[in-house]
Each structure stands twice: as C-alpha cells, then as structure tokens.
C-alpha cells in the first residue's frame, strides 16, 4: 500500500467502533446542514467518505453530489442512497461533468492533509469553475503545523467521553499506533498549513478567503476556511 487513496479503499481502524463512526458522520452532517444556503441549493461534498447521514443534508437542498476517490466507499454510497433522487454519487473524475457555475456550496472536509500542493491547486481550479457567483467553498479539518498526533488524540478522547465510547476510543488509539495508518503517515506524511498559507492558496485560486469561527466536526485544534466566489452584483 503506497498511497492514502489505497488506504481509504478498505475498512480501516480509524474509527474505534460503530458508535464513533455514527457520531462522527452525524456531527459532520449537522455542520453541513448549517452551511446549506437555501432549499434550492446545489451542494457538492468532495471527499465525503461514507457520509452516513447524507440523506439529512439532501433533505435541505435541491441536489447533493457526493464524491469520493475510493471505489469501495462509492459502492457503499450507491447502496445506501441509490434510491434517493436528490443524491448522486460520483467518482472524482465525474465531478468535471457537473455544469460550470451551477453549484452553490462545496464542502471539502478532512481531505487537504492527504493531497500534495499540486493536487490541491488543481482541485481548487476545478471547484472554482463549478461554483456560482456568490457560491462558497468550505475547506475543513485543515491541520496547522503545530498540531501533533497527541493533540488529535486528546480531541478524540474528549469526543469519546461526551459521546459515550471512551473505552473503545482508548482501544482504537492503541490499534492505530500499530496500524497501516501510522506507517503511511510516517512514510508519506500529512500536509499541514498555517492560516496565512491557506489564505494565499485560496486567493491564488480566485477565492476571497475567510477563517471560520469553528472547525467542522469534533477537533477544534484544526481549522475551517471559507472561500467566497465574488458576486458581480455586490461589486
């Protein structure tokens, strides 16, 4: 296994158990629902993972595109949501077929750390093309340079304490310490960005950047950014 894409195309130990997984996806779905601008909105969740509660997001918008690079994940999305006319599960290369300037909101949660800078810049160009004037790109769970695995572990344990899965979270952290995740993280690494770096990257891609007051999900040591597409009517 030589890439993060290969790693995610399988059942992984990243979740300590079913309760952890459910609470994670529920929290993210609730956060995304809060970002949907209107019932008529078109939304793209890029790098969505299994998106267990995507139907709740779809109920708040007109169309929800779910895109993930892992074939196994897409199979599960199709099995779970194939009968929902508001939801379409796409491979990353199919996102290019979405009409330009047709999307109101793009959410990219916990993906940047697995991309090279060149990959990120290429995707930003794609996302910018798909967004309408006045649309927003929300890039979440960005890891700052000063956040360590220990900080992430503390955030998980706090989430587990409040979510009622502390015992399984402790066991999960022990498993992760000896898992492929740790080996790949050491060999390939995770991309980390400062706030200033993210602002520069978003501006270079044609967005007006903003730091969100809180991160999507449970880990508030990480960052969420909003890239605004200027609306000529507001100029």
Each language-model region and where it sits:
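A conserved beta-strand element that flanks and buttresses the S-adenosyl-L-methionine
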Residues: 107
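Helix-capping/helix-break motifs at membrane-protein junctions
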Residues: 116-117
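Short catalytic micro-motifs in class I SAM-dependent methyltransferases
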Residues: 110-111
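A short glycine-rich, Lys/Arg-flanked "PGG" loop and its adjoining helix->strand segment in the class I
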Residues: 121-133
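Conserved beta-strand/loop positions that form the S-adenosyl-L-methionine
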Residues: 46
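Class I (Rossmann-like) S-adenosyl-L-methionine-dependent methyltransferase catalytic domain
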Residues: 1-36, 40, 50-85, 91-97, ...
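Structural signature of beta-strand start/N-cap positions in the alpha/beta core
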Residues: 42, 63, 102-104
